[in-house]
Amino acid sequence: MKKISIGFTNKSFRKDSQFIQEKVYNGMNHQIDYSILSNFDFVPKLISDSKEVIIWEWIEGSNVEITAESLEKIAYQLREIHNSNLVFPPSNHAFRVEQYLKILAEKGIKNPTIEKYNPFINEILVNMDKTKPLHNDLWLMNMVKKDKKIYFLDWEYASQGDIHFDLAYFIESARLDDDQEKIFLNFYGKLNYKLILLHRIFVLYLIILWVNAQETKYFDDTPYMEKLDNLYEQYKLWKE
């Protein structure tokens, strides 16, 4: 069994054609009934699931690159999730913010960007929809391409929520440029772009919050803080 250095929370291994994950709980993850994901043909086959360990079919594929074709597939698959009417766990978005803020307070970390946007983020949390099934963690590293298919992996944070959050999360985590974002959203379908913008701000805030709450700061959050400020200025102009 070979250990895999992937993800930041669980302990992951590969054994032959199986992807084995020892679950590490943080109060926000592994709430979903993973068996319901068999409704989607872009999720690897679930072999077994227990409180301690989950085992998936190993997908031997390649990294997903941003092209018009891949953006189309990702958009269509997200739309399929959002329209599926599957019952996911209740929205965990406000709880995630509360928990990360608590950790920062315990560590004595004061981040000016986080403090500046707290009231604005709370307003987003109050008003966001909480009824649609979401992946909630769609980084490119949580996808794999094989035989013209793109598989979505790592569903541990899946919950009900606002579709604009899922879309914004992918836009920001994949660092789509303006043209790529437009292509992606056009493939998805009719949307309220003001809500996309609001949730892009929320996603950047959440990424900054998350990385500062970790025992090891895995990456520099400066680009995310600069992007957050930029999008907030865009939002203010939008309101005017």
Say what each PLM segment does.
Residues 1-10, 113-116, 186-187:
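N-terminal non-globular leader segments, chiefly Sec-dependent signal peptides
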Residues 2-91:
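ATP-binding pocket architecture of kinase catalytic cores
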Residues 18, 54, 132, 151-153:
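Protein kinase-like catalytic core scaffold
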Residues 52-67, 80-83, 99-107, 205-219:
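A glycine-centered beta->alpha junction motif in the catalytic cores
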Residues 71-74, 114-117, 201, 224-228:
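Hydrophobic packing residues in well-ordered alpha-helices of helical domains and bundles
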Residues 86-136, 140-141, 146, 228, ...:
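An alpha-helical support segment within catalytic cores of ATP-dependent transferases
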Residues 146-194:
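Active-site Asp-x-Gly
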Residues 187-240:
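Helix-rich C-terminal or lid/interface subdomains of diverse kinases
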